[in-house]
A protein has these predicted regions:
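Short loop/turn motifs that connect adjacent beta-strands in outer-membrane beta-barrel proteins
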Residues: 41, 97-103, 167, 201-218
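Residue-level detector of the transmembrane beta-barrel scaffold of outer-membrane proteins
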Residues: 43-45, 102-106, 169-171, 193, ...
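Outer-membrane beta-barrel domain signature, especially the mid-to-C-terminal portions
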Residues: 135, 185, 191-193, 235
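Outer-membrane beta-barrel and related beta-rich outer-membrane complex signature
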Residues: 50-66, 71, 111-126, 182-186, ...
Length: 238
């Protein structure tokens, strides 16, 4: 019997011999990084990364199985999806010590690009059961769809860090992004942050007002940040 006697589902032998399902993914990803020392206190780097794949899937469901009513004379489908993500990152990092000050400046730029391409075909209720061909289904029993998307995000960022005598710390950062998923007048947005900290135990120990056996580390910290993010591709269209 083609049916499992205990449930409304196809017998595994029926599935193996009559239904055919295929899924394949061909994927490639990689990354290349280059770094150059301009001076002892300054280096620049560039990184490129890629992730791409093609996925194909097909289904052939035989007639008279445990299927939707409209699929009782069989169903076939073929789907292909292509995806590509590529990123570029450039950074310049400068770090130097001036007396009791440690200073660091990071500047950079990045670009991300994502592309997708999807196509889907489906046919059902064949004129000749189990003859899997799109020509074997009427116009009303076929469906073809295709969708392609492209998204690009470009960003520029910077961060300045300073410390004094391992006691006072200040960090200021900012980033501006330009995205293709927002309207032209709003596609640029900036989000900064600032933070500071004071290691009061270091100051008290330097003044001789605190024994590290009583308290060896204490820090006060305050920060403020603004967050920015774009949206998915075509999500603003109705």
């Amino acid at each position: 019997d083609r049916l499992d006697p205990w449930d409304e589902r196809d017998n595994p032998y029926w599935i193996v011999n009559r239904n055919h399902m295929y899924d394949d993914i061909d994927r490639f990803n990689g990354m290349l990084s280059i770094k150059a020392d301009i001076a002892k206190w300054w280096f620049v780097s560039y990184k490129i990364g890629i992730d791409r794949y093609t996925q194909t899937a097909s289904n052939r469901l035989a007639a008279n199985g445990v299927l939707k009513q409209v699929w009782q004379k069989g169903m076939m489908s073929d789907n292909t999806q292509q995806f590509r993500y590529m990123s570029h990152d450039f950074m310049s990092n400068m770090s130097h010590k001036f007396g009791d000050f440690d200073l660091n400046l990071l500047l950079g730029a990045t670009m991300d690009e994502t592309k997708t391409d999807r196509s889907s075909m489906m046919a059902w209720n064949f004129s000749v059961p189990d003859f899997f061909s799109y020509a074997n289904a009427s116009k009303d029993n076929k469906q073809f769809t295709h969708a392609a998307t492209k998204k690009r995000l470009v960003g520029a960022f910077g961060e300045f860090r300073a410390s004094w005598k391992n006691m006072l710390y200040l960090t200021v950062s900012g980033r501006n992004d330009w995205t293709s998923t927002l309207p032209l007048e709003n596609r640029s947005y900036f989000y900064p942050s600032v933070s500071g900290s004071f290691v009061f135990t270091e100051a008290l120990q330097r003044l001789g007002w605190l024994d590290d056996s009583v308290l060896n580390f204490g820090k006060l910290r305050a920060s403020w940040a603004k967050v920015g993010k774009d949206t998915g591709v075509y999500e603003l269209e109705t």
